[in-house]
Structures are given as C-alpha cells and as structure tokens.
Amino acid sequence: MQEYLEKRYALALYEIAEKNNKVDEYLRDLTDICDIFDENKEFYEVINHPKINTAKKKQLFTDLFKGKIDEELLSFMMILIEKDRILQLREILDQMEKIDLERRNTIRGIVKTVVPLLDEELEQLKAIFEKKYEKNILFDTKIDKSLLGGVYVKVGNDIIDGTIKSKVEEMKELMLKKE
C-alpha cells in the first residue's frame, strides 16, 4: 500500500515538474534534500519527532528551502508534512527517478571491474545492451578489487558475470562435488 502511495506522489510531482520543464531541477533538489536527511541526524530527529507539531515542521522547511527550491516543490513538501509522509521522501524520489527513466526510454545498469574501463569499452557494452533492450542504457560503473579480474554487468534481469572470482568459485564447487 505504501509503495502505491509513493508512486502516486511521485507521478503527481513528476507531472508538475514536466509541465514546468523542471524535471532535472526537481530531481536534483530532492536528492539534495534527501542527503540532508541522511547526513544531518538532528534535522531528521526534529522532522521525525512526534511532539513537534506540523506547523513547526512546515516553518522549518520554509525557513530552510524558501527561495532555494521551486515554489511548487516547496508546496509539495508542505503536503508531505501535512500528510505525515515527509520521511518517505527518499522512496518518492526513487519512484520519480524510475518514472523519469521510463519516460526517457532509459534503463540503468551496473558495470563492475577491477580497473576502470576505457570509454570505448563502456560504449561497446552500452551498444550491445541498447540493441538488446531497444532502450538507452545508463551505466553506473564501480571498481571492485574483490573480482580479481574480468567484468560483471547487470542490466534489468540479465547478469553477465565474466569475473575471475566467479570462475574460481565455479571451479571450487566442481572440485567439492567430485570429492
């Protein structure tokens, strides 16, 4: 039920942002606000405190964000405070990012390697998956020394694990089965 509400809030906000041609701005601002929640425990505790009334919480947000974020985004935050859903902001942001990717015909993928890939290598991977999915691919690249070598790629439900670590684990399982 809660995820359903988060999707509805995200869709409503996305449509406002899209109408105002401010989708990227809203996503950036929401990310920054969520980071404030994560990094500032005192702020989080004030927002989460049951004895601090809604009016004070709204005033705190107004003082902090008025003039720094779009008025309609601030109004949206006020609604979340009134509905006692402001702490679901990260989930609403996640849903809004999914909506944005969908509307842009884009999906996210993960590429893990021991050393950074060259731009050409990343473009080749991207081209392969864009052809398969018929969508734009946005890769998050991560360096993972535990892989020992090779490459790990995850896009949607597809996983390509060409890492040395996975090959060693497969060999270990085979050897244990023979015993």
Curated annotation (Swiss-Prot):
Establish whether keyword rRNA-binding is in the entry: no
The subcellular localization recorded is:
Cell membrane
Task: Give the disulfide map.
Answer: none
- Which UniProt keywords are present, listed alphabetically? ATP synthesis, Cell membrane, CF(1), Hydrogen ion transport, Ion transport, Membrane, Transport
For this protein, the record's InterPro entries field holds: ATP_synth_OSCP/delta_N_sf, ATPase_OSCP/d_CS, ATPase_OSCP/dsu
Q: Does the keyword Ion transport belong to this entry?
A: yes
Its GO CC terms are:
plasma membrane; proton-transporting ATP synthase complex
User: One GO MF term, please?
Assistant: proton-transporting ATP synthase activity, rotational mechanism
Query: What membrane topology does this protein have?
Result: Peripheral membrane protein
Question: Could you say which protein family the record assigns here?
Answer: Belongs to the ATPase delta chain family.
Task: Describe, as the record does, how this protein assembles with itself and its partners.
Answer: F-type ATPases have 2 components, F(1) - the catalytic core - and F(0) - the membrane proton channel. F(1) has five subunits: alpha(3), beta(3), gamma(1), delta(1), epsilon(1). F(0) has three main subunits: a(1), b(2) and c(10-14). The alpha and beta chains form an alternating ring which encloses part of the gamma chain. F(1) is attached to F(0) by a central stalk formed by the gamma and epsilon chains, while a peripheral stalk is formed by the delta and b chains.
Outline what the protein does: F(1)F(0) ATP synthase produces ATP from ADP in the presence of a proton or sodium gradient. F-type ATPases consist of two structural domains, F(1) containing the extramembraneous catalytic core and F(0) containing the membrane proton channel, linked together by a central stalk and a peripheral stalk. During catalysis, ATP synthesis in the catalytic domain of F(1) is coupled via a rotary mechanism of the central stalk subunits to proton translocation.
For this protein, the record's HAMAP family field holds: ATP_synth_delta_bact (MF_01416)
Q: Know the name of this protein?
A: ATP synthase subunit delta
